[in-house]
């Protein structure tokens, strides 16, 4: 992305390094002054220690009227005496240690040369250990200096504590090993490498000495050892030269673009082919040595078992169509070879061999073979010709195979011949028509058994795990997060320079690289407004050769401005990574939904019960449907059908229809928008019923309701339904209250629902969004048309949680989020998440779930149980008793103010057309059509006939 600007970056770096070389700033002046004073103190300390005289007055003794012999004077005598008293002979290295520490801490550094506090912390720990152990060793092994202990007070304390328990030898060993560990922490020297080096040198010296003693044999061995090394030595200069030439070229650009990443992805494809082919070739061979009758069925069974073993979940993801076709050809070749064996046997010894495949094929094609037998006069030849495709018959008539095997196959042909010898020969057209019917039936059977089609009724084994496992999802290979610090620093300098071109002074203070984007946090100079940078987002994207640049005006908790740039190589966030994260595992709510990962790569999950409703919007292809599927799959990983139930509305009949048949569904997936209003009306009625139950029990939400039911059941006092009345059911006693599950209503395309049904849907959704949170009913609304007529103010006011994918304009972004930013997203799951009660958006890279992942989880739940659909959800009840509180029927709508005048006009003129009403009263077509529909509802005019005309049913007025 920044390859074209590399030369500009280098010039910026050079100018920035040459400019500040004359003067030091304030902090650098203080550091350099402190460094000079530290060197002066180190020199003074060394002079005082090396010129120490025990006769000088000091902290240890007092002298009166004597000359001071220490070169540092009275201060030097006191300082040296104190250090000798504390450290003993280990006081001599202290001046050098002080000077070195001052140089490390206070010297002038480059802008990119930062202090690694972890490294220097370990070095400081190592230095402390070395000083303490050295004092202890000196106290044990060395004589005292003057009247001071050789290890000082520190050595005396350590030895007095260790000698009573460890003795001299044990104390020495412990201190020596601690001293070695301190040296490793201080210098980083590996004692193991030193031991290996000493061992290698010792072995080499021993081998050389042994070869010299061997004489002539040693001379024979030397040329054999030297010759292989010569070409290596000759190749080394050429290799180093080539490396030098590559290094002289712009090497950082090569590292920046990560060219080696696609090569690593192609490696698994090379290993898949040799792993699959031998298994397909070797499996069918052993049955050939056995009986021919069960051969084909065993091959089919083995083929079904080979597929999961030879192609794992990751291999299925990377497999190509060519590989699948090649494997299919191999299986077909073996099937043809197996079919050739029974055909030869039937022609020679049909009465001695009982072949299940042949008899099954003959049972299906009896009539076809008998018809063609009259024209070819050779039954055996016809069997060989028709024996090519017995697989369809074997699949469909496997249940009758045992009955057919009881009779010898040789008895079939005489029966067929005797039946058709007495009849007349049919016409060629009848034979051709019958053959077409048979071939079409076989083709339909083959199409139903196609493995690439979705099987509606599949008997799957019931899983033993209580919830779906991670093995159902695709697991990507381990990816190394390579971060090029030099490239990031160059980009940071480039950002600063481009902002300087627009007269904006800013400094990059923090860089946060992520899987998709990298955020640069800018510290603006005093007086610079954030709006200036926001208005330059397009210009910055052009200057930085980036696809889009997003400006984060406010970062919570920081006084900086964020600048988000897309990475050169984008990583895919998979659903398995987020579900395996601790954030998802630690969440206890059954309505936990997965969103993806933030810019730092951390998992982002949310609780739908706290949202409590979410609006998902974005253009076509931005990842909106994948995001909705990820939310549903995450709840399927957390909740059982007793905890969460779904009502899914899918106008496109593609995205949510795959969930048909899971036990979580309350009704079939709604694909007709006219039924969608009934489903929403049922949700409103269920919400009202739940509120009545909660008011009777004295709880405030669904969690308290379920907890109270559980406590009552544990106490032995179950609660009966207080809203039950006589006649509601066939039972004489009210039923017990059961646990209420959360209900999640998922609408994949909300705009289509608004266009078809209209204002009623908006009112129903508004009622659910206002009151349904405590009742445990939550909405997930998705739309690809973020316009104000779809996302109305009434809906936005009641759905505070929004998720915006890529949109085309700032207006659409403001429609969804009430702020701009979504127009700068990168697509393919890149989203802005606005939590409830917050005005700051969070950039999230949406998790990806493939179709295979969705089918795997859905089949896992289908194997656990079947759904218990409620028919009233879709069918509804349009009677007056089914009206919700505050709802009016269509007949109770207010009549138009011109209704009476239109009635008078229609009755007099005896014409009830819409165009006539429109011309007479000079109104719009929609209003005129509405008035005519009201006339039809009142029985004044009839319904339109086949020609569109309406008859006036009301009698004409009586004239005097």
Curated annotation (Swiss-Prot):
Primary localization: membrane
Residues at which ATP binds: 621-626
Pfam families: FtsK_4TM (PF13491), FtsK_alpha (PF17854), FtsK_gamma (PF09397), FtsK_SpoIIIE (PF01580)
Transmembrane segments: 35-55, 84-104, 117-137, 145-165, 172-192
GO CC terms of this entry: plasma membrane
SUPFAM superfamilies xrefs: P-loop containing nucleoside triphosphate hydrolases, Winged helix' DNA-binding domain
Keywords: ATP-binding, Cell cycle, Cell division, Cell inner membrane, Cell membrane, Chromosome partition, DNA-binding, Membrane, Nucleotide-binding, Transmembrane, Transmembrane helix
GO molecular function: ATP binding; DNA binding; DNA translocase activity
Bilayer topology: Multi-pass membrane protein
Topology, Cytoplasmic side: 193-960
Tagged with keyword Cell inner membrane: yes
Location in the cell: Cell inner membrane
Record-annotated FtsK domain positions: 601-814
Cleaved signal peptide residues: none
Coiled coil: none
GO BP of this protein: cell division; chromosome segregation
Origin: domain of life: Bacteria
Protein family (similarity comment): Belongs to the FtsK/SpoIIIE/SftA family.
Domain free text: Consists of an N-terminal domain, which is sufficient for the localization to the septal ring and is required for cell division, followed by a linker domain, and a C-terminal domain, which forms the translocation motor involved in chromosome segregation. The C-terminal domain can be further subdivided into alpha, beta and gamma subdomains. The alpha and beta subdomains multimerise to produce a hexameric ring, contain the nucleotide binding motif and form the DNA pump.
Function statement: Essential cell division protein that coordinates cell division and chromosome segregation. The N-terminus is involved in assembly of the cell-division machinery. The C-terminus functions as a DNA motor that moves dsDNA in an ATP-dependent manner towards the dif recombination site, which is located within the replication terminus region. Translocation stops specifically at Xer-dif sites, where FtsK interacts with the Xer recombinase, allowing activation of chromosome unlinking by recombination. FtsK orienting polar sequences (KOPS) guide the direction of DNA translocation.
PANTHER family: DNA TRANSLOCASE FTSK (PTHR22683:SF41), SPORULATION PROTEIN RELATED (PTHR22683)
Subunit structure: Homohexamer. Forms a ring that surrounds DNA.
The protein, known as: DNA translocase FtsK
Native organism: Vibrio cholerae serotype O1 (strain ATCC 39315 / El Tor Inaba N16961)
């Amino acid at each position: 992305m920044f390859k074209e600007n590399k030369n500009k970056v280098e010039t910026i770096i050079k100018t920035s390094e040459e400019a500040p070389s004359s003067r030091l700033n304030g902090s650098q002046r203080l550091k350099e002054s402190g460094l000079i004073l530290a060197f002066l103190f180190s020199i003074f300390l060394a002079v005082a220690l090396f010129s120490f005289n025990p006769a000088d007055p000091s902290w240890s003794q007092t002298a009166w009227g004597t000359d001071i012999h220490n070169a540092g004077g009275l201060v030097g005598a006191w300082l040296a005496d104190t250090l000798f008293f504390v450290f003993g002979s280990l006081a001599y290295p202290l001046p050098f240690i002080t000077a070195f520490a001052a140089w490390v801490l206070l010297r002038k550094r480059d802008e990119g040369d930062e202090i690694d506090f972890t490294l220097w912390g370990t070095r400081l720990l190592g230095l402390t250990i070395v000083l303490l152990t050295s004092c202890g060793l000196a106290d044990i092994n060395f004589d005292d200096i003057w009247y001071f202990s050789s290890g000082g007070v520190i050595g005396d304390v350590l030895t007095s504590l260790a000698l009573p328990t460890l003795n001299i030898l044990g104390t020495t060993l412990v201190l020596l090993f601690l001293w070695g560990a301190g040296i490793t922490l201080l210098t980083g020297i590996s004692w193991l490498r030193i031991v290996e080096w000493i061992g290698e040198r010792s072995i080499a010296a021993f081998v050389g000495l042994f070869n010299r003693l061997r004489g002539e044999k040693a001379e024979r061995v030397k040329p054999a050892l030297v010759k292989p090394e010569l070409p290596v030595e000759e190749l080394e200069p050429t290799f180093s030269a080539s490396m030098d030439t590559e290094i002289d070229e712009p090497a950082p650009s090569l590292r920046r673009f990560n060219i080696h990443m696609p090569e690593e992805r192609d490696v698994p494809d090379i290993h898949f082919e040799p792993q699959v082919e031998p298994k397909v070739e070797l499996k069918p061979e052993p049955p050939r040595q056995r009986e021919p009758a069960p051969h084909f069925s065993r091959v089919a069974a083995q083929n079904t078992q080979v597929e999961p073993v030879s192609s794992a979940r990751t291999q299925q993801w990377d497999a190509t169509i060519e590989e699948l076709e090649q494997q299919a050809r191999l299986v077909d070749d073996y099937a043809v070879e197996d079919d050739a064996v029974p055909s030869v046997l039937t022609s020679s010894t049909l009465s001695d061999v009982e072949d299940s495949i042949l008899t099954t094929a003959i049972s299906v094609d009896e009539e076809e073979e008998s018809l063609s037998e009259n024209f070819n006069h050779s039954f055996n030849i016809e069997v060989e010709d028709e024996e090519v495709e017995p697989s369809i018959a074997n699949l469909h008539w496997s249940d009758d195979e045992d009955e057919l095997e009881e009779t010898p196959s040789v008895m079939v042909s005489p029966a067929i011949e005797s039946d058709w010898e007495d009849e007349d020969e049919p016409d060629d057209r009848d034979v051709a028509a019958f053959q077409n019917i048979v071939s079409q039936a076989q083709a339909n059977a083959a199409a139903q058994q196609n493995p690439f089609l979705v099987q509606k009724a599949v008997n799957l084994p019931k899983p033993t795990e209580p919830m779906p496992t991670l093995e159902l999802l695709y697991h990507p290979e381990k990816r190394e997060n390579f971060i090029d610090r030099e490239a990031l620093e160059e980009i940071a300098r480039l950002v600063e320079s481009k902002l300087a071109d627009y007269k904006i002074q800013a400094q990059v203070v923090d860089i946060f690289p992520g899987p998709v984007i990298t955020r640069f946090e800018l510290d603006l100079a005093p007086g610079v407004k954030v709006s200036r940078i926001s208005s330059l987002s397009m210009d910055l994207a052009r200057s930085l050769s980036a696809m889009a640049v997003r400006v984060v005006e406010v970062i919570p908790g920081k006084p900086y401005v964020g600048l988000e740039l897309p990475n050169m190589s984008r990583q895919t966030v998979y659903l398995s990574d987020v579900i395996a994260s601790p954030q998802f595992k630690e969440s206890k709510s059954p309505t936990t939904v997965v969103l993806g990962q933030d810019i730092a790569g951390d998992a982002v999950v949310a609780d739908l019960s706290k949202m409590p409703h979410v609006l998902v919007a974005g253009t076509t292809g931005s990842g909106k449907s994948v995001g909705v599927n990820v939310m549903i799959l995450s709840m399927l990983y957390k909740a059982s059908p007793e905890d969460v139930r779904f009502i899914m509305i899918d106008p496109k009949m593609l995205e949510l229809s795959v969930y048909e048949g899971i036990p979580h569904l309350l009704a079939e997936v709604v694909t007709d928008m006219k039924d969608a209003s009934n489903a929403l009306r049922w949700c409103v009625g269920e919400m009202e019923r739940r509120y009545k139950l909660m008011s009777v029990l004295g709880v405030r939400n669904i969690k308290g309701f379920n907890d109270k039911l559980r406590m009552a059941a544990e106490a032995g006092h179950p609660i009966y339904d207080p809203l039950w009345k006589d006649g509601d059911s066939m039972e004489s006693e009210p039923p017990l209250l059961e646990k209420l599950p959360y209900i999640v209503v998922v609408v994949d395309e909300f705009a289509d629902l608004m266009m078809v049904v209209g204002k009623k849907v908006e009112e129903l959704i508004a009622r659910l969004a206002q009151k349904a949170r405590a009742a445990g009913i939550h909405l997930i609304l998705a739309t690809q048309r973020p316009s104000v007529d779809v996302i109305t103010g009434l809906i936005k006011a009641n759905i505070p949680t929004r998720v915006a994918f890529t949109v085309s304009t700032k207006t659409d972004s403001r429609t969804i989020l009430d702020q701009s930013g979504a127009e700068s997203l990168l697509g393919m799951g890149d989203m802005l998440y606005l939590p409830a009660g917050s005005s700051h958006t969070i950039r999230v890279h949406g998790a990806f779930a493939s179709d295979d992942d969705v089918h795997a989880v859905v089949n896992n739940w289908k194997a656990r149980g079947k759904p218990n659909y409620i028919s009233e959800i879709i069918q509804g009840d349009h009677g007056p008793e089914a009206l919700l509180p505050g709802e009016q029927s269509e007949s109770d709508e207010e009549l138009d103010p011109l209704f009476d005048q239109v009635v008078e006009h229609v009755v007099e003129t005896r014409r009830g057309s819409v165009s006539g009403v429109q011309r007479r009263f000079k109104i719009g077509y929609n209003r005129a059509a509405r008035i005519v529909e009201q006339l039809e509802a009142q029985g004044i005019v009839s319904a339109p006939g086949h020609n569109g005309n309406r008859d006036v049913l009301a009698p004409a007025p009586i004239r005097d």
